[in-house]
Amino acid sequence: NYKRSLRAAFFIAIEDDCVRKNPFSFALNKVLEDNRGEKTVLTPEQEVSLIDFVQNDKVYRKYVDELIILLGTGLRISEFCGLTTNLDFKNRLIRVDHQLLRDPKSGYYIETPKTKSGYREIPMSEPVYQALKRVVKNRGKKTTIMIDGYTNFLFLKRDGTPKVGMDYNNMIRNLLKKYNKQHKEPLPNI
């Protein structure tokens, strides 16, 4: 993101004849190595095994609906965290038109999808539909802070603030560790 902003700023500086060359007009992947671990999609059998494990685990059972929704929709974590009570249960659709993010310095903020294909409607399978119904019911009438015009986020922390990707990254990492300790066939990094 920083590189994109700097590149745009230098492009304008070139247009205004303030500088001759754009020092940020290079492909970042030529300079930095992508050291993120490869993500693997779970097989249907692995998904069932993970959900069964979570349902029977004293620590992680409270996350079962969240995992069902994540696995059943393929939402990005920030899109998932941005879900509000404004769901189309009649047509069983999840409309994706924003994502919830949090910056350590500036706090929570909403971002719209970067491309047209990011705006989409995701059909609710029966398990996802039932999980969302339970989440809305268990959430009750709690009101949450308004973030860039959005309120009533579905997934809240104990203090009433919305959960963000980092909250789930830690939970999922620890869940997978525990699952893999107890099963012969470990799950891949997801």
Specify the residue positions occupied by each region the protein language model found.
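Non-catalytic DNA-binding core/recognition domains of DNA-processing enzymes
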Residues: 1-12, 27, 124
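Gram-positive cell-envelope targeting signals
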Residues: 3, 40-42, 79-81, 163-168, ...
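Short, basic/aromatic-rich helical patch in the C-terminal catalytic core of site-specific tyrosine
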Residues: 6-10, 80, 172-173, 190
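Hydrophobic recognition helices of helix-based DNA-binding modules
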Residues: 6-14, 132-135, 175, 179
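Basic, Lys/Arg- and aromatic-enriched nucleic-acid-binding interface segment
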Residues: 15, 19-77, 81, 90, ...
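Conserved tyrosine-mediated DNA breakage-rejoining catalytic core shared by Y-recombinases
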Residues: 29, 82-140
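Short, basic (Lys/Arg/His-rich) helix/loop patches that form interaction surfaces
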Residues: 52-63, 73, 122, 138-153, ...
